[in-house]
A protein has these predicted regions:
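Structured loop/turn residues at beta-strand edges in well-structured enzyme cores
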Residues: 37, 79, 118
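Short amphipathic alpha-helices and their capping/turn segments at secondary-structure boundaries
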Residues: 26-35, 63-75, 112-115, 149-151
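Short, surface-exposed acidic-centric catalytic microdomains
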Residues: 55-101
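Glycine/proline-rich loop-helix segments at beta-alpha junctions forming the active-site rim
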Residues: 2-8, 18-22, 88-196
């Protein structure tokens, strides 16, 4: 990776006045990037537990995601996998869960970071925020229909529901996801990681 370019991005993030409250508390932007990454995961934003550990998806959601991808934890945190949330910081608690990711992070920082990872073969879009941003008008009327239509976005994007335990009702109401979609995700991830 071009370390100078990457260091400049980190410096910009830390000096951005909108991230001041995090920088002052010693909290760095939380993501995982590598020039050798072949699979990119774009999720929502770090949760409270992730903010405390500073490790992306270091929670129950991450355990489920690793399972859905058909890999182990070591592979998930290897240089083959990049994790770039829609917000690099925990946005705080809302009335019904975490607050949404702040929109400026993806708009102002994603492209510069993505330019440093030229070998991405598959981008897994997790949840509605990443789908709305990256699929734009290509997104269906809701998350469920977008995930159901995942084949339309391949081979570049693979939209999936958030693996949060809070989504257990959705998963129960939509058994086709784990029955039909997850096996395809596992197969694609396996093929990409095996192709060196």
């Amino acid at each position: 990776m071009n370390d100078k370019k990457f260091d400049k991005i980190i410096k910009r993030l830390k000096e951005d006045s909108r991230n001041k409250s995090y920088t002052e508390r010693g909290i760095p932007p939380i993501f995982q990037v590598s020039p050798k990454a072949q699979i990119l995961i774009i999720g929502q934003a770090p949760g409270k537990k992730v903010e405390e550990s500073l490790i992306p998806f270091n929670d129950k959601s991450g355990e489920k995601l690793v399972q859905w991808m058909g890999i182990d934890r070591d592979t998930f945190y290897s240089e083959k996998i990049a994790i770039l949330p829609m917000d690099f910081y925990y946005p705080g608690k809302g009335k019904t869960g975490d607050l949404p990711p702040r929109s400026f992070i993806a708009k102002e920082y994603h492209k510069d970071i993505l330019d440093l990872m030229p070998d991405i073969k598959l981008t897994i879009l997790i949840g509605s925020y990443s789908m709305k941003y990256y699929l734009g008008k290509g997104m269906k009327e809701n998350l469920t229909e977008t995930v159901r239509s995942y084949r339309e976005y391949l081979p570049k994007y693979f939209p999936i529901v958030h693996p949060s335990p809070l989504n257990f009702r959705w998963q129960k109401a939509n058994p086709w996801f784990e029955g039909e979609v997850v096996p395809v995700l596992k197969e694609m991830v396996g093929k990409i990681l095996a192709d060196r």
